[in-house]
Amino acid sequence: MDFWLVCYDVRDDKRRRKLAKLLEQRCQRVQYSVFECPLPEKVLTDLLHRRWLKELNLKEDSLRAYPLQRQSRSQAKIFGSPDLYEPPDFLIL
């Protein structure tokens, strides 16, 4: 399973709320506009182009997805909550 760190900067409240709800369907919110997403790259790319980017005004907003390596995730230093997200052993698609 691949992990992605997805973050956004969206100016409009309505667009921001809609994008956050979409991300929460597949990802774990770790900060206000930052999510950890346990998704294969193909699924992430599909969601980006079919769902998430459609909610943005790309002249004003931005969305970024950074790959997280398993080793870097295990070395993460976390203070406060939430804890490091560990997805279930299986995913129903």
Swiss-Prot record:
Residues that bind Mg(2+)? D9
Record carries keyword Magnesium: yes
Q: What is its EC number?
A: 3.1.-.-
The lineage's top-level taxon is Bacteria
Required co-factors: Mg(2+)
Please cite one Gene Ontology biological process associated with this protein. Answer: maintenance of CRISPR repeat elements
Q: Which GO terms describe its molecular function?
A: metal ion binding; RNA endonuclease activity
Q: What does this protein do?
A: CRISPR (clustered regularly interspaced short palindromic repeat), is an adaptive immune system that provides protection against mobile genetic elements (viruses, transposable elements and conjugative plasmids). CRISPR clusters contain sequences complementary to antecedent mobile elements and target invading nucleic acids. CRISPR clusters are transcribed and processed into CRISPR RNA (crRNA). Functions as a ssRNA-specific endoribonuclease. Involved in the integration of spacer DNA into the CRISPR cassette.
By sequence similarity, the record places it as follows:
Belongs to the CRISPR-associated endoribonuclease Cas2 protein family.
Oligomer status and interactors: Homodimer, forms a heterotetramer with a Cas1 homodimer.
What is the designated name of this protein? CRISPR-associated endoribonuclease Cas2 2
Organism of this sequence: Synechocystis sp. (strain ATCC 27184 / PCC 6803 / Kazusa)
